[in-house]
Amino acid sequence: MNPIAFHVGNLAIRWYGVVISIGAALGLLLAMYNCKIREASYDEFINMFLIAFPSAIIGARLYYVIFEFEDYRDNLINIFNIRQGGLAIHGGIIFGVLAVYIYLKYRKESFFEYVDVAAPSIILGQAIGRWGNFFNSEAHGGPVTKEFISKFPQFIQNGMFIEGTYYHPTFLYESIWNFIVCIFLVYLLKKTKKKGIVFMAYIGLYSLGRFFIEGLRTDSLYLGSIRVAQLISVLGIILSIFFIYNIIKKEKRY
C-alpha cells in the first residue's frame, strides 16, 4: 500500500493527511445541516471547530506520545512528525471537548447545545479518518487466513497483506461501526430536544464499538497489562449511561 497520495514539488502529501482533511470537511457539511435542525448558529460552530480541531490534533498526538515515549526519547523532534500516523483518538476527543467547553463557557453559550450538533460530525470524521490507517498499513488486527480475508473486496485484501501475512482489517470494522452510529445520532438529533442526549449517546456508542474492536488490534497502547483504549471505553460507557439516565430523570421531574 502506497501511503503517498501525490507530491507538491518535493513535498510528499500522504493519504493519512488527505483522509483526515476529507473527514473534517464532510463533518463541517453535516454540521451545517444539523445546525438547522437544532436552530444553532453555524458561524458559532465554525468558530468552535477552529479551536477544537487543532486542539484535538495536539491532544491525539500528546496522548500517543505519552504511552509510546520510549520510541521518541532519543529523537524528540519526531514527536512533531504526525504525517506517518501516531494520533490516538481518545486524546483528541478529550482535548477537543475540553477546548470547546472553555470556549463556549467564555462565549456564554450552551455547551451541550453545540456538542450535540457536533457529535454526528465527530463520529463521521472518525469513520472516514480510519481509512488513513489503511493507507498507512497500521491499526490492523492479528493474522487471519486467506479464506477469511477473501470475503472482503480485493483492495482490502491487498492492503491487509503485509510482509507475507493477512491481517484483520480492524480499521474497516471501526469505520463501519462509526458510520452506523453517525446515522443513528442524526436520527436522534431530530427526535429529541433534550440537551446532552446526543453527545452522551455518541460517547457511549463509540466506546462500545471501540471496546470490542480494540481486542482484535495488535498495536494497542498499554497501561501495564491493560489496553488503555478498552479502559477508556469502559469509562465512556459508564459515563454515558450515568449522564443519559440523569438527563431523562431530570426532564421527567419537571
Curated annotation (Swiss-Prot):
GO CC aspect terms: plasma membrane
Keywords: Cell membrane, Membrane, Transferase, Transmembrane, Transmembrane helix
Bilayer topology annotation: Multi-pass membrane protein
An MF annotation (GO) of this entry: phosphatidylglycerol-prolipoprotein diacylglyceryl transferase activity
Sequence intervals crossing the membrane: 11-31, 49-69, 84-104, 109-129, 169-189, 196-216, 228-248
Annotated compartments: Cell membrane
First-tier enzyme category under EC: transferase
Pathway involvement of the protein, from the record: Protein modification; lipoprotein biosynthesis (diacylglyceryl transfer)
GO annotation (BP), single: lipoprotein biosynthetic process
InterPro entries in the record: Lgt
Positions contributing to a 1,2-diacyl-sn-glycero-3-phospho-(1'-sn-glycerol) binding: 130
Signal peptide limits: none
Keyword Oxidoreductase part of the UniProt annotation: no
EC number: 2.5.1.145
NCBIfam families xref list: lgt
Name under which the protein is recorded: Phosphatidylglycerol--prolipoprotein diacylglyceryl transferase
Organism: Clostridium botulinum (strain Langeland / NCTC 10281 / Type F)
